[in-house]
Amino acid sequence: MPTNVSGTKDVPIMKCPVCKTPELQMMDVEDGLTFYNCPQCCGNWVKGAEYWKWLEQHGPNLPERSAADSKLLLAEPGFHIDCPECRFRMVKYLVGHGLSFTLDHCEGCKGVWFDRNEWEALKERNLHDDLHSMLTSFWQNAAHKEARKKRLEQIYIARFGPDDFAEIARVRAWLEARANKQHLIAFLTDKDPFDL
């Protein structure tokens, strides 16, 4: 059962950065890793130093699992929130790797806020031990590129329809594998390739 954070003398009272009112409740989620949980929105705060300590004791980095249709309901609020520990405005970081949510990271105290089920979604994919990588520009560039690709794909599906988009994507992949790709494209785009 979670213990009240305000019940300890050396730990300041932390309020939920999303709901603003409930005190965060201390709870162990992994062996050696403590979260501070909001009983109202089910979000979780993990202190940066505690995560790093857990990561060092965790063992080797687990291999990423392939994307699967998760049944977890996520509850990302969509607005910027302030750190429950030091009150800095937190920065949103895209997770990527097939997951479309963001994590809120405090640049001041290095803690991370997980909205409902975000930690669980990371664990399903074995990405929960990669937070340090997610906060790098390399990871973020790849995550933003993935998000742009997904948005453009949705635009093309809306424009062409799902069946036509699937077919043109198949043809495009086929063309990319051909050495004479430019000649094939010229043939396709010529109004009448048989008119000399």
Q: Where are the model-predicted features located?
A:
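Short amphipathic alpha-helical linker/capping segments at the junctions of internal repeats
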Residues: H58-L72, K123-H144
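Short cysteine-rich clusters marking metal-coordination/redox-active sites
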Residues: C16-C19, C38, C83-C86, C106
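C-terminal, charged low-complexity interaction regions
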Residues: A173-L196
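Cysteine-rich micro-motifs
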Residues: G32-G43, S100-V112
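Cys/His-rich microdomains that often coordinate metals
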Residues: P22-L24, W45, R87-M90, W113
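Short, structured motif recognition centered on aromatic/hydrophobic residues
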Residues: N44-V46, Y51, V112-F114, W119
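Charged/polar low-complexity intrinsically disordered segments, enriched in acidic residues
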Residues: S137-R178
